[in-house]
A protein has these predicted regions:
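A hydrophobic C-terminal alpha-helical subdomain
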Residues: 118-168
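Conserved residues in the N-terminal Rossmann fold of short-chain dehydrogenase/reductase
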Residues: 115
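Oxidoreductase cofactor-interface core, primarily capturing Rossmann-like NAD(P)-dependent enzymes
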Residues: 2-112, 121-128
Length: 168
């Protein structure tokens, strides 16, 4: 996922850090996880809703924190093949509607997907609003199937399995 020139401050600051690391001339590997699945574990679920500033049909690639840790361990174990690379990772991808349906099945009660108007988010936090606007317009573009095939050692969690693990 290219994070340069997105207009999203917290993406662009990460890009600057990555460029600085590359310019230091030291060995490095950069792991670029997508949106964290754990971001969905908010108080809204207790109120039977999943609310995000994305349309219900927008596909959002997501990473489980467990998978980020497992992939990081793999990078540390193998070392050399990963040096000098940036690897973007994602565990799964679902729409808001799909996520709400899966969460409903796991929790045993109806979770309604609510699309928060982006204007409301802009009023509260422009940086976050820009990020969600970008997610709405630009897919992160990770080839999840190829990633998982290339690194089968990672116990990649589909959203449904992640939800069962976290919510039961």
């Amino acid at each position: 996922m290219l994070i340069k020139k997105t207009g999203i401050p917290h993406f662009e600051s990460k890009y600057k850090v990555e460029q600085h690391i590359k310019n230091l001339g030291i060995p490095y590997t950069i792991i670029g996880p997508t949106f964290f699945m754990e971001n969905l574990l908010g108080p809204g679920l207790e109120q039977s809703q999943l609310a995000l500033p994305l349309s219900s049909s927008t596909i959002l690639q997501q990473s489980a924190l467990q998978n980020i840790a497992e992939f990081s361990a793999l990078v540390l174990e193998r070392g050399k093949p990963f040096l000098g690379k940036r690897i973007d990772i994602a565990s799964d991808e679902v729409t808001g509607e799909q996520a709400a349906e899966i969460l409903s099945n796991v929790l045993g009660y109806k979770i309604k997907y609510v699309s928060i108007p982006l204007e409301q988010v802009y009023q509260a936090n422009e940086d976050m609003a820009r990020m969600y606007d970008w997610y709405e317009r630009v897919a992160t573009g990770i080839d999840i199937a190829s990633l998982h095939q290339e690194y089968p050692e990672v116990n990649w969690l589909p959203f449904k399995d992640w939800a069962k693990l976290k919510l039961r």
